[in-house]
Amino acid sequence: LILDHTKSQDFYGDFMLSYNKTFKDFTIGVNAGGSMMNSSYDQWMITPIAKSGAPYTEDLSCNQFVLSDIYLNSSENYGGLTTKNWERAIFATAQVTWQDKVTVEGSYRDDWYRAFTQFKDMDPHFAYYSAGASAQMNKILVLPEQINELKLRASYSEVGNSIPNNLFLASAKRNPATGAYISSAIINFKNPKPETTQSFEAGFDISLLDRSISLQATYYNAIMKNQFMKYEGAAGKEIYINGGKVRNQGIELTASYIFAPNNNFSWITNFNYAYNDNKILTVARKQNGQKYIHEIDMGNLSGLKIKFEEGGSYGDLYAVDFMRDEITGEIVVDPQTGAPFKLNGQANEYLGNMNAKHTLGWSNTFNYKDFSFYFLIDGKIGGKVISFTEAYLDYFGTSQRTADARDYALNNNLYWTSEDGVVTKPGMYIPGTNQVVPVDQYYQTIGGGSPVGRNYVYDATNFRLREISLAYTFRNLFGQSKNLTVSANARNLFFLYIDAPIDPDTSLSTQNALGNVDIFSMPTTRSFGISLKASF
């Protein structure tokens, strides 16, 4: 007999007031409001335990259930979780426009979080704001006639979010019979702050030559600080801190061109480009000034780690390397088995950053009478992708690489012999060296679930034909201005360039550090379709 009880409740409400007015050359818009959220969750489960400590196995027929009759000396027969949370917010925005030439706007938001009420001498609310301005320079200044529109813009904003509420007393296991909470495995969070992002953007939009050419350019600089992080403390306790400061800055460019020499033909092309530079400015420090070490293992004892180090970038990848002779620099090999030695547990070889700095896209639309043809090419330059699939195939000797190595050994009479002369196996040269090792031992050393990372980390640069479509419109098919458009389309057709043996866009999970990771992922799919669109 198991008794399980679950109850959850959620409530959300908001309100908004708006005011708009025009005074001669000025237009004013104001919005103000607030929101509130309440949620609660209560769950507990009881499993009867005999005095011996073992669960009951015989059938039980009960007509009365009393908590005090349950044997409570075992921690295995009960469990529970209780969470309560609330958030409150007030906000306001204002916008002032002068003669449709200059616009200035700003916003203010104040948030209250229940999570912060759990700490003494701390105000549970935090304020954020933003401000921006834009100017239509073609309406303010006399510009060359080739310039149809020129807009300048700039903005600054702050946004934030609470620390998780369910880390502390609001979320703990409890004994449903006594109501007592079981001590948490979390060490007190000292001086908590909300995660905050401060962003600045500036750019311009311009249209030229009867708006046939359009350009947009934006520069951005965003700093994330007080990031919520978890570290392992003494005796299995968990330490939670706000720490670190990360900067993202870059540019975004968009260009378009429209060529329409007559009413029967037009060509519209669009190009976009983005560059992002990420840098970890500071990392969290202990009270004695020592830096916290924050890293994410790509898998249990995988030998591949994402490390967050001051001066580095988010997504820096490190891996285990071979053990080398301190004098000659040669890879150390076991003389009896021929297996190269690895520096297990020491993921110190930097292999690059997993994130691409450059992304691009180019689309084209050709219209001729009632026909329309469209295609999109996109890609990215840089970044790394990891294939555990290739590592496991090598480990089990089922990859083309291992087959080629065995064939080369047989065709070239290349063999490895153990130090005592007892064992002889097909051999191979360790890539880049003159050292001969057994084919099987080499690939079972560098492959598998704990690989020598450099062998299975690939450049993620790629370009592909992302989408293509052909459409025809039957005009006035159902009457005046009642048309039917038939189109055939395909997505993700093929790569124009790729270096990795897998799709660089593959992702094992949405969790941190699990993007760009392949572990026997499903093959990349192409899609084909036909669509009908009727307009009346």
Protein language model features and the residues they cover:
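Conserved small-residue
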Residues: 45-52, 241-244, 258-354, 385, ...
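Short, flexible active-site loops
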Residues: 345-347, 359, 371, 448-455
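Flexible glycine/proline-enriched surface loops and loop-helix/loop-strand junctions
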Residues: 184-186, 345-346, 356-357
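Extracellular/periplasmic, surface-exposed regions of secreted and cell-surface proteins
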Residues: 1-305, 452-536
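Glycine-rich, aromatic-lined ligand/substrate-binding cores of catalytic
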Residues: 351-388
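Short, surface-exposed charged micro-motifs
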Residues: 59, 63, 93, 205, ...
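Extracytoplasmic gating/loop element in the C-terminal half of outer-membrane beta-barrel translocons
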Residues: 113, 380-485
